[in-house]
Amino acid sequence: KEQTMKFALKSLLVATLTMTSTMALSHNHESSLEHALQSSERNAKNSARDEYRHPAQTLAFFGFKPTMTVVEIAPGGGWYSEILAPALKEQGTYYAAHFPADSSVGYYQRSLAGFKQKVAEDERFSSVKITEFAPVTHLDIAPAGSADMVLTFRNVHNWYMGKDKSGALSAFQAFYKALKPGGTLGLVEHRLAEERADEDQKTSGYMKQSYVVDLAKQAGFELVASSEINANPKDTADHPKGVWTLPPSLRLGEQDADKYKAIGESDRMTLKFKKPL
């Protein structure tokens, strides 16, 4: 009887310690990301766009944890990098698959140079691993089978506009190769209505959700879930200068600026895919 009681108490103690440890780990995960999001070191213009980009909700939907190995595709000026790099710095790994160093495109060179400067000078970026990515030509974004998560934000239209379907498909195949079995691909993209012509994807900067899902499936991914976190019902996706008519680009300048500011940033699909086990 006494032994049974001791065993029961021991089991209860183990269960309590396990629960406490799990709760503490969960809290650490949340606080690491929350700290990165709320940091005063974030660029003020970047933080102001949270109302349209919903980073906390988006990363939660994808299942992001600061212990993961995460690859961000084409981080550009580092809008999401300001969140991901510090959140992953202590316990995880962050690969920034940036523009190729041998690119002849001036914008790519300037963007890469600016990002490298951040990595060199900003302590928050000190653990960032920079790799190269371009559809078809530069696809080694991380060691094969090493990543828990690949993230791409508003990029698919660029690959499609630049190299048509083959370019976009090569990107998804690179993501698949980098991920571990069971790994997650998190994707956000400007959304074109399904009834619109496929040709509109070549110039508008918007993509059909069904088309993007099909590309991912062709590369081997399974669609896990979709979310309306980044939806904007005010966006009709039929603007004179495509998606760039809207904020933050406002390609028309002062012409109808108030109208487009009232619409806000684009309507976006938010998709979570999995590499099968």
Task: Please provide the spans of the model-predicted regions.
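A short glycine-rich, Lys/Arg-flanked "PGG" loop and its adjoining helix->strand segment in the class I
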Residues: A85-P86, S166-P181
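N-terminal signal peptide c-region/cleavage motif recognized by signal peptidases
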Residues: S21-M23
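Class I SAM-dependent methyltransferase Rossmann-like catalytic core
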Residues: S32-P66, I83
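Conserved beta-strand signature within the Rossmann-like core of class I S-adenosyl-L-methionine
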Residues: G182-H190
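A short acidic, Gly/Pro-enriched loop at the edge of an enzyme's catalytic core
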Residues: L139-L151
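Conserved class I S-adenosyl-L-methionine
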Residues: P66-G76
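C-terminal lobe and adjacent flexible extensions of AdoMet/dcAdoMet transferase-like proteins
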Residues: A219, D258-L277
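S-adenosyl-L-methionine
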Residues: Y108-L139
